[in-house]
Structures are given as structure tokens and as C-alpha cells.
């Protein structure tokens, strides 16, 4: 019975620990074998960790590329073509407008600074969490109300019912706020608008 138990233990050790001889071993030899197994595992561990680290870095890079590609595909305006896909580098630099400007259709889009006064075209509403869309050479009809934008945003075909053509004006709207602007102005001059720059890719 004891021999059968020893044989069973030897078989378990040979399958799950490391290769040991088929013959029965004394406790001293078993301790020595356990130490060898531990040393082998310690040697294998840095390689396994290195492989896992490389695999994790590859997975993280792939996820970052996917996220960046998704962000680039979202349109900022129904009248403008969506921006070209940025390079798939994970080190893309994002910049915010400071200060944030709004402006009519004669004002160029881009990153607004105190030196280059450009109308921000990456606006996002912090209240309804919608991207702000713009329509050049249009203004909002005075009959617009909150429910109209709530129900029709961002479908241009439904929104155009309350858009009127007017040269030089740019119509801005999110799901909860709207405004028509003719000249360059600071966003802070419009306290009712809860809009912020949603970052530009440089």
C-alpha cells in the first residue's frame, strides 16, 4: 500500500512539477529536485513576463489606434467634409483653443489663440454631451425652441426647416442650445452656452 502511494506521488510530481526519475527518491533528493524545479521556474518567469509585457503593449497600441480612428470619423459639421484621418500614431498631440472663439462664415476655423483668432470647429456641449454642429451662411429662425433641437439633432434634413440663408452668418447648435453669429466673439460672452473646445489634433 505504501509503495502504491509513493508511486502515485512520483507520477504526480513527474507530471506537474518537473521531470524526476521513475525510481523512488529519498527526501533529500526530493528537496534537491524541488529546488531545481524552483530554479527552472524562476528562469522561465522573466521570459514569460517579458512576453506578456510585449503582448500587453501590442494590445494597448491596437486599442489606442482603434479609439483614435473612431474619434476621427465623427463629423463636426454637416456642411463640412469630415476631417482626413490622422496618422495612426499613438503619440498624436491634442490642443485646445484658448480662448475659445465663435465667428461668422468669414472667420476661419481652427485652433483659436490670442494671436490667431479662429472660430473653434471642435466644440462640445458639457450639458447635453453633443458635438456642436455648424452651418455656414445660415442663421436659425426665431421660432426655434429646445424641443425642436432635442427631437431633430443632428439630422440636417429635419434641422433645415428652421435654417434661413444669410451671407456671412454661421449657425451653431447642439441638442440643448443654439446661436447664430456674424462676427468674431469670445465664447465667454455667451454665458448661456455650456460649450468647450473638444481638442484639435495637431
From Swiss-Prot:
Per the record, what is the consequence of mutating residue 170 to W? Causes Kupffer's vesicle formation defects, melanosome transport delays and visual impairment
Expression tissues: Ubiquitously expressed during early development and in adult tissues including the eye, brain, heart and kidney.
Following inactivation of the gene, the phenotype reported is: Results in the cardinal features of Bardet-Biedl syndrome, including defects to the ciliated Kupffer's vesicle, delayed retrograde melanosome transport and impaired visual behavior.
What keywords tag this UniProt record?
Answer: Cytoplasm
User: Which residue positions does the secretion signal occupy?
Assistant: none
Presence of the UniProt keyword Cytoplasm in the record: yes
- Region (Disordered) residue ranges read 71-90
Task: Name its cellular compartments.
Answer: Cytoplasm; Photoreceptor inner segment
Instruction: Name a single GO cellular component.
Output: cytosol
Q: Where is the composition biased (Polar residues)?
A: 74-90
Q: What domain of life?
A: Eukaryota
Query: What is known about what this protein does?
Result: May be involved in photoreceptor outer segment disk morphogenesis.
Q: What is this protein called?
A: Cilia- and flagella-associated protein 418
Amino acid at each position: 500500500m505504501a509503495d502504491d502511494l509513493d508511486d502515485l506521488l512520483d507520477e504526480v510530481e513527474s507530471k506537474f512539477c518537473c521531470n524526476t526519475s521513475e525510481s523512488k527518491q529519498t527526501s533529500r533528493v526530493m528537496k534537491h529536485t524541488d529546488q531545481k524545479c524552483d530554479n527552472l521556474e524562476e528562469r522561465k518567469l522573466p521570459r514569460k513576463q517579458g512576453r506578456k509585457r510585449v503582448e500587453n503593449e501590442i494590445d494597448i497600441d491596437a486599442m489606442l489606434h482603434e479609439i483614435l480612428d473612431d474619434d476621427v470619423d465623427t463629423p463636426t459639421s454637416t456642411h463640412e467634409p469630415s476631417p482626413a484621418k490622422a496618422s495612426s500614431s499613438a503619440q498624436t498631440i491634442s490642443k485646445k483653443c484658448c480662448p475659445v472663439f465663435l465667428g461668422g462664415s468669414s472667420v476661419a476655423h481652427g485652433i483659436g489663440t490670442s494671436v490667431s483668432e479662429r472660430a473653434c470647429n471642435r466644440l462640445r456641449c458639457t450639458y447635453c454631451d453633443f458635438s456642436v454642429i455648424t452651418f455656414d451662411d445660415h442663421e436659425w429662425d426665431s421660432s426655434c425652441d429646445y424641443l425642436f433641437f432635442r427631437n431633430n439633432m443632428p439630422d440636417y434634413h429635419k434641422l433645415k426647416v428652421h435654417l434661413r440663408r444669410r451671407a456671412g452668418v454661421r449657425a451653431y447648435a447642439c441638442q440643448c442650445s443654439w446661436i447664430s453669429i456674424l462676427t468674431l466673439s469670445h465664447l465667454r460672452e455667451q454665458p448661456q452656452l455650456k460649450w468647450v473646445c473638444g481638442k484639435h489634433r495637431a
